[in-house]
Design a protein with these regions (language model features):
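Extreme N-terminal, non-catalytic leader segments
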Residues: 1-42
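A short, well-structured juxtamembrane/interface segment
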Residues: 26-33, 127-140, 154-157
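Hydrophobic anchor at the beta1->P-loop junction of P-loop NTPases
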Residues: 45
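A conserved segment at the C-terminal end of the G1
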Residues: 54-67
Length: 186
């Protein structure tokens, strides 16, 4: 968060820490922008930390075929279309810097990231169908028909994702255990 000024830090705190604000922003987003249902041909990447999920994410994102949230969608990741009307990326948003994990991976404000976890933290299993609305809103935002997401926490949601999107692919990379453990120690 040291890359943000006082206003940006407080906006992030407000937008991401209050369930009421997250739910309200999602409700407004649906009212204003939810128009289409997109085909079920998405890709979900999940796995243990340092297993290669970020590398796969970046490779797929570079194809330009998929819609996915990026750092520029922060902090209103549950209202990406509405936020895009307010926040216009600057040229400097494409500048790369080391991500906050300090693991050597370079990102920009236009890089994809696992922001769908905000959805899962906001809504419980009774609202699981809302995830389809969320994915459709992201696809509308990026004018794509295929969604992809890397989220290591989805390892516990494989059944849910499979039920929601039976035609989608779930990629689970595996890494040699000693290499993975060594990577986690760094």
């Amino acid at each position: 968060m040291d890359r943000y000024n006082w206003f940006q830090r407080n906006l992030h705190t407000l937008a991401l820490s209050k369930k009421l604000i997250k739910e309200a922003s999602f409700d407004i987003e649906k009212i204003l922008f939810l128009k289409n249902r997109y085909p079920d041909n998405h890709i979900f990447i999940t796995g243990l930390a340092r297993s290669g999920t970020t590398s796969i994410l970046n490779a797929l994102y570079q194809t330009g075929d998929f819609g996915s949230l990026t750092y520029s969608d922060m902090p209103f990741v549950l209202a990406p279309n509405l936020w895009s009307k307010v926040h216009k990326p600057k040229k400097s948003d494409s500048n790369f810097f080391e991500r906050y994990h300090e693991d050597g991976i370079q990102i920009s404000q236009l890089s994809p990231e696992a922001f769908e976890e905000v959805f899962w933290d906001t809504f419980d299993d009774r609202n699981i169908e809302e995830f389809k609305n969320y994915v459709d809103l992201i696809l509308r935002r990026y004018k794509k028909t295929k969604y992809f997401r890397k989220n290591n926490q989805n390892i516990k949601r494989i059944g849910t994702i499979r039920n929601l999107y039976p035609n989608s692919k779930i990629l689970i990379p595996f890494r040699e255990p000693l290499q993975q453990a060594n990577s986690l120690l760094r």
